[in-house]
Structure formats: structure tokens, C-alpha cells
Amino acid sequence: MKNCYNKNGYRETIQKGLNAIRSLSGNISIGKGIKEEQLKKLKSEIKNADAIVIGAGAGLSTSAGLTYSGNRFEKYFFDFAEKYGIKDIYSGGFYPFPNNETKWAWWARHIYFNRYINPPKPVYRNLLSLLKDKNYFVITTNVDHQFQRAGFDKNKLFYTQGNYGLFQSVNSEIQKTYNNENWVMKAMEAQGFIKDKNGVFIVPDNKEIFMQIPTNLIPKCPDDNSDMTINLRVDNYFVEDEGWHKASEAYYNFLEENKNKHILFLELGVGANTPMIIKYPFWQMTIENEKAVYVCINYGEVFCPQEIEDRSICIDGDIGSVLELIK
């Protein structure tokens, strides 16, 4: 099915990132003006831009309360921490569990508490309220599906790195994905989690939950009964299914349709893990279009190339707090 899509926004954005690395001087700026001036300018740009491209990284979900360590980890993974010495949700995803029953018990929780619940803070919904009447598109390396949960138009979203809510077969010949919601719910119940009055799984008061699921619940591919894995870009076997290619082409088309307009590249919570997908391409596209403005909002990590500092807004702070200030 992917051959039906002629434009690959993912490939094009990676190329733009490479171009940025080759062409930039390497001189970095933290932007111009005090924070109050930057906030005022940001509010004006969101209001007046012809198009807005949101580039979202892990910092956005962290701001929304979907943290991978601390209280959330201790609340839902305390037993794994005690038995296996796992320190946080992220590192637990790489732990060599002793068997599949334990591995998939972990992943059921990992997926559920990041994909199938609403975040503690309304950061995504507040972002949508700022953009709902705008000409926008979202590219994100996040895999937690929180944009759609908040009500963003799914036709304006490109999840480049996969989705916690999808499985794929380990058989690389099967190039499609499978919704895992029903499986996740069964696996959570099998571990002893109970639902609260809002229908959300919680740990029972006695904390008696299990770190294994029944063998018959280990997910298998419905097409060839092979083992399954989560649809995440962790190696060259990541499945770019029809939905992925459709979104990639939509992103490409949005950039093409708006490339000579007053376009706002709004980067939220993008760190150093995947700068080639969002940060560097945003820099390059801002350089190429004199009408473009680049925005970087992040906690403790905000900067832009010196070449575009006059058309950049860099705000160091919690994303949710910044959005509240410009509502």
C-alpha cells in the first residue's frame, strides 16, 4: 500500500536536517529580548501566521505530567523496581526479562499508562485551544497518541517514530500494524489492576498485582501466529504502514503548500535525541524562507542558530506554563 504515496515527508525532513548541519556556521544564540518580550511576540506570531508547523518532542508529554520516573513510576511499577532494580519506565523498556510472560506484563503497563490514559495536566488541550482555528500540522517523535486524545485532527498529525497503541509482527514480510487496545485491557486485568469510578486502571489498595500475564495472553500475529512487538522505530524492521505513509505525504504536502508563506515553526520539548527529525529541519526551513519564524520552547535547553536569531523566539521554561501565559 505504501507505493500509492509518492511524497515522503519523513525522508525530505531528514534531508533538510542534513542540509542544516552542512550549511550552518555552528554559532548558537539563545534569542533576543527578555522573556516578557518573547511571550508577546509568540502570541502575535500564533495569531498572524499563515501556517503553523508544530514539532513536538518528549518534553511536551513531560510537561503534561506523563513522566517516566518519580511518583508515576513508583506508583505503577514498584514491584518491577523492587525485583529487577529498574529505575524508570524508559530503561525498563530495554530490560532483559526472564520470560515472555513477564516481558509482556511490563509492556502492558508501559503502554497503558502512557497511551490509554489522559495526562494529569491539560497541556495538549491548551495547545489545541490556541491552534484549533489555525492552519496547522503536527510532526512528532512522541509515540503516546496524546495529540489525538486531546482532540487534534488526525489528518494533521504525523507520528514519525510509531505508536504505543500498535503492534507489528516480528516477521518483516508482514508490513502492517495491529491495534492493541483490547489486548492491553485484558493484560492489565490479568495482572490484578482494577478500574476506578472513571474506568481507569489503578493499583488495588492491597497492592496485590502480578508481574506476569498468562501464557495464552502473549500476543501473536493474527496473520501467521508469529511473535509481536510494539510499533516503535528501534531498528530497521520498523513497519511504516499505510497510515504512516499517508501522514508522511500529508506533512510533505503541507510544507509545500505553505513554503513561501508566513510560516511559524513551533518546536515544543525537542531535545538532543532526534534533532534530525524536527529541530534541524525547522532551522533549515526558517533559513530558506525569509517570512518564516522559528520558536523553541523547552525546559533548560533553548537555542537557535545565529543565522536566524532575528527571526527566532527562544523561551526557557515549562511548556504548559508558557501556554497558560499566552492564552
Question: Over which residues does each language-model region extend?
Answer:
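Conserved catalytic alpha/beta core of Sir2/sirtuin-type deacylases, generalized to analogous enzyme cores
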Residues: M1-K327
